[in-house]
């Protein structure tokens, strides 16, 4: 009898432990160096698209992004990384992690400014993809319209480097050969690129004859470049977007359309995207003038009812940086991940993470939010211009 009682008691303890372990947690501290703790939160979300809103060029955000992405790849089957980059940038990044381009190749990577955390993520992806079947590899897609002229130039030279254009007419052959051999970016920008755009607009069949399956990549880069120029025009040719202006709305439309196209081309894949936090909100909530939030962001449209991602989207907002403990002497900037449906904001008198939205439930804006222990100590990443991949390896 005593043995039966002990067995029953042991079973009850195990059952209680399992219930406690499996029950969704309201918060969890995350180890930025290892990612430990993420599984205790996100394992309950079986979404198809995970979107993270970051503060650009901040080390702690990049560390969390890396840990989160690795977890989603290994535990959730995510295989597509969506980037806030133009199509040309994403294409060259993808060629690198597919191990078709080396990290110090002449095409593209001398155009990038990247950090140690970026390098570590791309190197990890490259190693992950080695000796895997194509269907199991990680790929990268840029869905923004922000390619620089240098990136478009590098992309065109790379795409056309070994092509045989003989199936196209003579005029198309001459244009593509000139682009292939062009050694001066200014000539490409002023002469060859306008001709490529005209060909794409008036006679795309010749591009398809010349490039076959590769034509679609050139067409999307040319389309993205045109959209980027239109956005620049709508912004009165200013480098920084006016948050309440028509350029922002135009860019959000492009982000939405491009992500939808990528999803519809591969509707069974799982995706992770890292974007500026202003783009990542599930519901509009800020009406104040000068707000850093974007009205009608592309994510808010994807999260709406009857959207193509309705019920398949998980949003983690990293813009929330209220102080959650007294500022101390700690060297580590601890990060806590909160489930907005279960947790109350410990750093706000209102008890809400989104204090500027008193009438909107937190969970309708993002399913998860991040709070740093010392938000004033979040550090800027050490960016490295030029051939970073090669330079970093040699350090």
Description of each model-found segment:
Residues 17-395:
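Compositional signal for N-terminal targeting/processing segments
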Residues 1-12:
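N-terminal Sec-pathway targeting helices
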């Amino acid at each position: 009898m005593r043995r039966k009682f002990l067995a029953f008691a042991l079973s009850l303890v195990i059952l209680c432990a399992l219930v406690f372990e499996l029950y969704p947690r309201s918060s969890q501290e995350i180890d930025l160096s290892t990612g430990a703790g993420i599984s205790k939160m996100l394992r309950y979300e079986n979404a198809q698209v995970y979107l993270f809103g970051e503060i650009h060029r901040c080390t702690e955000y990049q560390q969390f992004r890396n840990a989160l992405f690795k977890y989603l790849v290994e535990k959730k089957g995510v295989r597509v990384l969506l980037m806030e980059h133009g199509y040309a940038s994403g294409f060259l990044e993808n060629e690198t992690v597919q191990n078709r381009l080396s990290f110090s190749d002449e095409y593209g990577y001398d155009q990038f400014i990247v950090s140690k955390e970026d390098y570590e993520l791309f190197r990890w992806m490259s190693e992950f993809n080695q000796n895997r079947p194509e269907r199991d590899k990680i790929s990268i897609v840029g869905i923004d319209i922000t390619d620089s002229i240098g990136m478009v130039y590098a992309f065109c030279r790379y795409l056309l480097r070994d092509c045989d254009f003989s199936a196209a007419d003579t005029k198309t052959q001459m244009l593509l050969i000139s682009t292939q051999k062009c050694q001066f970016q200014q000539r490409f920008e002023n002469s060859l690129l306008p001709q490529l755009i005209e060909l794409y607009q008036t006679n795309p069949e010749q591009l398809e004859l010349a490039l076959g399956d590769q034509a679609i990549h050139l067409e999307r880069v040319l389309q993205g470049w045109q959209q980027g120029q239109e956005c620049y025009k709508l912004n009165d040719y200013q480098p920084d977007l006016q948050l309440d202006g028509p350029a922002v709305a135009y860019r959000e439309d492009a982000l939405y359309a491009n992500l939808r196209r990528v999803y519809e081309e591969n509707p069974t894949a799982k995706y992770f995207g890292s974007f500026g936090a202003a783009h990542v909100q599930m519901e509009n909530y800020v009406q104040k003038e000068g707000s850093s939030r974007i009205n009608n962001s592309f994510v808010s449209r994807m999260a709406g009812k009857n959207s193509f991602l309705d019920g398949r989207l998980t949003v983690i907002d990293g813009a929330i940086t209220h102080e959650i403990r007294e500022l101390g002497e700690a060297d580590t900037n601890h990060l806590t991940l909160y489930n907005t449906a279960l947790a109350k904001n410990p750093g706000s008198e209102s008890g809400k993470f989104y204090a500027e939205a008193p009438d909107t439930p937190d969970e309708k804006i993002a399913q998860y939010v991040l709070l740093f222990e010392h938000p004033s100590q979040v550090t800027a990443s050490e960016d490295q211009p030029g051939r970073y991949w090669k330079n970093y390896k040699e350090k």
